[in-house]
Amino acid sequence: MGDNKNNGDSGKLLYCSFCGKSQHEVRKLIAGPSVYVCDECVELCNDIIREEIKEISPKRDNDKLPTPHELRAHLDDYVIGQDRAKKVLSVAVYNHYKRLKNSSPKDGVELGKSNILLIGPTGSGKTLLAETLARSLNVPFTMADATTLTEAGYVGEDVENIIQKLLQKCDYDVEKAQRGIVYIDEIDKISRKSDNPSITRDVSGEGVQQALLKLIEGTVAAVPPQGGRKHPQQEFLQVDTSKILFICGGAFAGLEKVIEQRAHVGSGIGFGAQVKGEKDKATISETLSQVEPGDLVKYGLIPEFIGRLPVVATLTELDEEALVQILSEPKNALTKQYNALFEMEGVELEFREDALKAIAHKAMSRKTGARGLRSIVEGILLDTMYDIPSIDGVVKAVVDESVVNGESAPILIYERNETQVASGEQ
């Protein structure tokens, strides 16, 4: 019988030398010198090797933790301004991963989680800060939109789906996922509709806050290995969310009025009160920097939820000068990205200073912050990017203020020193 198993003569059945299955029981049988191995055994060996690599890799990842100064320097490379927020984030993130490295309590002192709440206007860099931190630490990162979340059992996305997305980002490696960062955007949109608890269910407001509580604080979430609930017999993955850093962000429109109302209570009215002039009035950013937990409760976040986000950082509204810097200075600046695209066609792209200022001015007037810069630049260069692959001899394209304002098309410079306005201007 043993001779038959390894006999490759025609008419004889071949068997896997490892599991003993015949060639008819498996999809593929791979031959070696006097031995055979089936596809199932190969897959099993791969799984064993992958598991061993998983056990080793987290230890390697944890060897060197960047200091707050190093984290801040990395943020400076990609994010313009927001100095205070960068410092707060760098310290909070450093403390979080220091806590993970020293997980055994010393003298019975257990370190709490330092989840973060970012408050700032649209396009001020909240998402970019969180994403850049995850990249600098080489940890998995995922984003969720709070407005799409609902309580379990209601139509919408369950909060547990956030962990599912994080697992997908690291190929369902639970150890890696547990060291990841989750950014939940539009968190202000799940504030409850009034200060008074309602007898009706608020499934997309307070209900979601309640559902997020345990996840953010730390619980063991059961997640299906490949998503969905189609296979009840599948063994669920157990993910400890106490090791995951949660960063929540929102614009919190109108919060400054709540803060001002609190600040002005007891400031005096009548003839003896001091009247503040226009110059004495704080900007929205300055007012938001004075936020207190009570203000967030009045805004509509429940006290328990605020308690799970002990680190609060406020971001300032970007001015025109900051937007000009964002366009050209960061490592991943928009102008550098479009330069790279044009270089692939053998064309140099030049943005003149007046063009950068005009783009920034347009973004300011649209009130979109840095988020609106890409759509403006894309609109300016669309026709040129459409035409250049079909035009021979172009070596340079120049964008100035008139191009941004729609008065002319980018200037194209040819190899023979001929200058011509790009198509679109007759």
From Swiss-Prot:
Q: Which gene carries the instructions for this protein?
A: clpX
State one Pfam family annotation.
ClpB_D2-small
Annotated ClpX-type ZB domain residues: 4-57
Q: Which InterPro entries match?
A: AAA+_ATPase, ATP-dep_Clp_protease_ClpX, ATPase_AAA_core, Clp_ATPase_C, Clp_protease_ATP-bd_su_ClpX, ClpX_bact, P-loop_NTPase, Znf_CppX_C4
An MF annotation (GO) of this entry: ATP-dependent protein folding chaperone
User: How does this polypeptide assemble, per the annotation?
Assistant: Component of the ClpX-ClpP complex. Forms a hexameric ring that, in the presence of ATP, binds to fourteen ClpP subunits assembled into a disk-like structure with a central cavity, resembling the structure of eukaryotic proteasomes.
Query: What is this protein's record name?
Result: ATP-dependent Clp protease ATP-binding subunit ClpX
What is any one of the record's Gene Ontology cellular component terms?
HslUV protease complex
- Locate the residues binding ATP: P121, T122, G123, S124, G125, K126, T127, L128
**What organism does the record attribute this protein to?**
Shewanella oneidensis (strain ATCC 700550 / JCM 31522 / CIP 106686 / LMG 19005 / NCIMB 14063 / MR-1)
User: Hey, which family's this protein in?
Assistant: Belongs to the ClpX chaperone family.
- Cite the PROSITE patterns for this sequence: CLPX_ZB
